[in-house]
From Swiss-Prot:
InterPro entries: Peptidase_S1_PA, Peptidase_S1_PA_chymotrypsin, Peptidase_S1A, Trypsin_dom, TRYPSIN_HIS, TRYPSIN_SER. Belongs to the peptidase S1 family. Granzyme subfamily. Residues 22-245 form the Peptidase S1 domain. The gene is CMA1. Keywords: Disulfide bond, Glycoprotein, Hydrolase, Protease, Secreted, Serine protease, Signal, Zymogen. SMART domains: Tryp_SPc (SM00020). It comes from Cavia porcellus. It is found in: Secreted; Cytoplasmic granule. Disulfide bonds join C51-C67, C144-C209, C175-C188. The active site is at H66, D110, S203. This is Chymase. GO terms for biological process: proteolysis. Coiled coil: none annotated.
Length: 247
């Protein structure tokens, strides 16, 4: 093992929220992030919610485990989620692979693979995103990018268009106020002196560092103040590879 790095849960409601909406960012150039997936979810209780995710194989999307539901539909090639284009590909999820050690109470091992009903067609607007190797060292201070659909401010309604924001990888000490933060399993991201962050709503989107998906949006403060916590993808490469090989 490599030792490196949308309802709220009632018992977490005073400290953190499931994350994903971009605050302090800018609108992406349409279809410049062809790996992005917009997930429409019907929860186990029957209500609708949404998440982000990203295409890693033509028939597999990677996202957060807390985005699981009774049924999921993946939308690819989306820029404005309210404005359907010819670029869209809408695919049903036929199987959800939550990490076997996922803990919903503390949001550890917050990672899930989604198998699609068929392979996506790769186009200029739909493409895959590479993953890091298992032992992949990331230095604090490095600048990365996160993307998602959602609020551009805590009090604002969700954005219809895909937004992105630059975020700094922080020393794990910056996340010590999150009682269950685990540096081996998670990344601490976002300068607390900046009003740039991701927030509740569109969890599951990627943290992109030099063209590689290094993290998955997991949770943040309820007030959206950074830093925020991402699942560290490199730790889960053996599990990801096992699922992909078997399917």
């Amino acid at each position: 093992m490599c030792l490196l790095s949308l309802p709220l849960l009632l018992f977490l409601q005073y400290t953190r929220a499931k994350a994903g909406e971009v605050i302090g960012g800018t609108e992406c150039k349409p279809h410049s992030r062809p790996y992005m997936a917009y997930l429409e979810i019907v929860s186990s209780e029957g209500y609708e919610k949404d998440c982000g995710g990203f295409l890693i194989r033509r028939n597999f999307v990677l996202t957060a485990a807390h985005c699981a539901g009774r049924s999921l539909t993946v939308n690819l090639g989306v820029h404005n989620k309210k404005m359907k284009e010819d670029t869209w590909q809408r695919l049903k999820v036929i199987k959800q692979f939550l990490h076997p050690n996922y803990n919903s109470s503390v949001l550890l091992h917050d990672i899930m693979l989604l198998k699609l009903e068929k392979k996506a067609n790769l186009t200029l607007a739909v493409g895959t995103l590479p993953l890091p190797p298992e032992c992949n060292f990331l230095t604090s201070g490095r600048m990365c990018r996160a993307a998602g659909w959602g609020r551009t401010n805590v009090e604002e309604p969700a954005s219809d268009t895909l937004q992105e924001v630059k975020l700094r990888l922080m020393d794990p000490q910056a996340c010590k106020h999150f009682p269950n933060f685990n540096h081996n399993l998670q990344l601490c991201v976002g300068n607390p002196r900046k009003r740039k962050s991701v927030f509740k709503g569109d969890s599951g989107g990627p943290l992109l560092c030099a063209g590689i998906a290094q993290g998955i949006v997991s949770y943040a403060h309820r007030n959206a103040k950074p830093p925020v916590v991402f699942t560290r993808i490199s730790h889960y490469r053996p599990w990801i590879n096992k699922i992909l090989k078997a399917n």
